[in-house]
Amino acid sequence: RQRQMCIRDRNVEDYFSDCAEEVGLELETRGIELVYANYVEDNVQVIADGEQIRRVIHNIISNAIKYMDKPKGIIQIRIKDVGDFIQVEIEDNGKGIAAKDLPSIFDRFYRTDVSRNSSKGGSGIGLSIVKKILEDHGGKVWATSRLGIGTIMYFVLRKYQEVPMK
């Protein structure tokens, strides 16, 4: 059953700080520190289905939690303004993803060797859902990672722009 997307313009600052607050509470219970920074001006709006983008953030973060191997876990969320898009960066200091695995992490059911052999293996669909939701929004998602250091997940959403009246 496909849920109808409820897309509307949302204030970037309000929306993402709410998301970060929710995530922060969950991370706190796990002893992981959240660092949140919004570099976007006050009244910028983004076109998004609020529930779906929450799910994107949740899936990325739960992945980061799953592969967190440091005694002091830190997850950073940065919101940046890049032209017609808002870019969200979610960085962790977990175990990282091997270069050979990076291109495939958004494929359905793909799991790295590490996760296949770990007790924490997930279903392998979390990040493919992320990719689908973002593509439905006309956005995209990608990642950079260094083994032993951590991973940065990036995604972009289109800004809402008032069309000036002629």
What are the functions of these language-model segments?
Residues 2-7:
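Short, small-residue-biased leader/transition segments that mark boundaries at the very start
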Residues 8-24:
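A conserved beta-strand-to-alpha-helix junction within the catalytic ATP-binding
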Residues 28, 33-44:
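Conserved catalytic submotifs in the C-terminal HATPase_c
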Residues 92:
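Acidic ATP/Mg2+-coordinating residue in the GHKL
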Residues 74-84:
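Short beta-strand/loop element within the Bergerat-fold HATPase_c
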Residues 97-111:
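Short conserved segment of the HATPase_c
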Residues 138-139:
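Conserved glycine-rich
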